Each structure stands twice: as structure tokens, then as C-alpha cells.
Amino acid sequence: MTIQLIPEKTEFRISTTDLETVYTESNGIKLRLDVQHIDDFKNDTYRDIEIHFLVVAELRCITMNFFDINHQNYAIDGQEFTIDVIDFWEKYGYHPDSGFYQINNSDILISKKSLYDPRNNLDLKHYLINGYDSHIEIIASKYEYRYL
């Protein structure tokens, strides 16, 4: 089965060689990583961000790049765009391939949803954040972010 990735429509693009993850039972997961806003992208600069996943069912930290280990087994929704990345970003307010995805056809959600959310009220999603040499997968309900 081809893994279907849907880019999150965020104002930033993840571009990182380092991911820092902090997990607590009571406060979910906080990720610190490097991103680029459109102006950063134009100037080849980066800024730190913290993404906070509030209700978390599962966290997976894998020390391999997602695209390397799945090189012929994934598809990114919307990758058939034909306009310039900057033009797209300016027009729609988000990067067409943010590096932050939902896995649309998640085997984990299919197999564990009844365990993690038996009442079906958490609206769990399978998120993927790819780093340079690693990636993180998170089963969570929602997230918020702030620049540091």
C-alpha cells in the first residue's frame, strides 16, 4: 500500500537537521525544530519553533529519514502543482510541501483506533515530521505552535 501524505497547511516549512522531543503524560509532546517562514526561505535563514501536540496516543522516533526508507512507497498529495513555490506560498499562505504531514491511510490508526479512542471523540490523526536523518510519527488529536 502506498503511504498517502497530506502536507499540513502551515505558514512555515520544516527544514531541520535536528529535532528535540519532550514527552510528558500530562502535557503531551513538545517538538523543537528549525523552520522557514516565506521571508526566511527567500533569505536562506531559519528560526526555531515549538510544536505542541496536546492529546497524544503514540510517539515514534525513527533514526532514518522517512523518504529514504520509503523511497518508492509514498505519495504526497498536491505534488502535481506547476507554479513556482514562492508564487504558491505567497498566493495561498502556505508552502505546498511543508515537511509536516498527516498520513491519510495510516495502518496504525486503522489497527489501534479502537484501543486509543474507543469512544471516537479524540479525532486522532497520524502526523509525520521528517528531519534530515530521522523522522517522528505522532498519533495525536491536535497541535499548536509558537516561534521561539
What name fits each language-model region?
Residues M1-L148:
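Surface-exposed, interaction-prone regions used to assemble/regulate multi-protein complexes
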